[in-house]
């Protein structure tokens, strides 16, 4: 019996990430970079949602980015398959028949990056391990971490936005979901005695106006990434929950302190430069591989507390303060 033939090297690669969250795209960045490293001559396109698409601007691994309209994801995938005819498709997204369509129409594909996840393996690492087993990336690249490319001009702007601060502390209070909201933000900011900056959307900044922290101006996503990069270069720290902006901070080299409650830090942690604080680590209701099926997830109804997620409240301001760098002596 003859050996199965090796598929020809792809010349057109499509990566599909339509899971909906900014953090989901950041966790998929190692997939994009590993594919480019294995197939440097191939053109690589990414189909994703705004606003995260801007994070791929200036990334040399990416030939083009296509934006999908929310609610029309399957149509966007079908249109891209028909228009571009990729040789290889890798998708993080399976809902609405997207995986079936890719398998039917693409010569080569990897459509289930969520298969049999161990409860303690980081999501990005799991993606890469599966792709290596499918022989579409180099096995040596299974340890890649998310990385966002900034221009020199953007980095200069980030330095200017943060001013002359030594070892700056940036707080990212927005949670995205009620179940991830940390109740101790103002206590932390007060304890930092004016050192902290708050980053967020205009509504969040308005809520903090006159409060115990300084406000960064409203920033675009890439401007925010540049500020985070400046924090990293100056030995500062970015503090926040399990959110997309925090993943952006880690991906531009900032040290992070992540506050984790319902999501397990062992799977969704922010990366090697930071520390992830897990509230109520032994919670019996936490489902590491099925977080959206947790009893608390959608309505933030905690079995242990009538006033909000007990796991988030369990992370005290003192635990965070212990990880905040002290300004250098002048």
What are these regions (language model features)?
Residues 19, 41-76, 280:
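Conserved nucleotide-sugar phosphate-binding/catalytic loop shared by glycosyltransferases and other
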Residues 75, 181-266:
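Donor-binding and catalytic core of enzymes assembling or modifying cell-surface/extracellular glycoconjugates
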Residues 117, 211, 251-330:
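Nucleotide-sugar donor-binding patch of glycosyltransferase catalytic domains
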Residues 115-168, 284, 297-298, 307-314, ...:
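A nucleotide-sugar donor-handling region in carbohydrate enzymes
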Residues 25-37, 51-52, 188:
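Short amphipathic alpha-helix
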Residues 54-60, 99-104, 204-212, 248, ...:
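Short loop/helix-cap segments at secondary-structure boundaries that form the rim of catalytic
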Residues 15, 19, 114-115, 145-209, ...:
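Active-site donor-nucleotide binding/catalytic segment of nucleotide-sugar enzymes
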Residues 62-147, 167-172, 263-266:
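Conserved nucleotide-diphosphate donor binding/catalytic pocket of glycan-assembly enzymes
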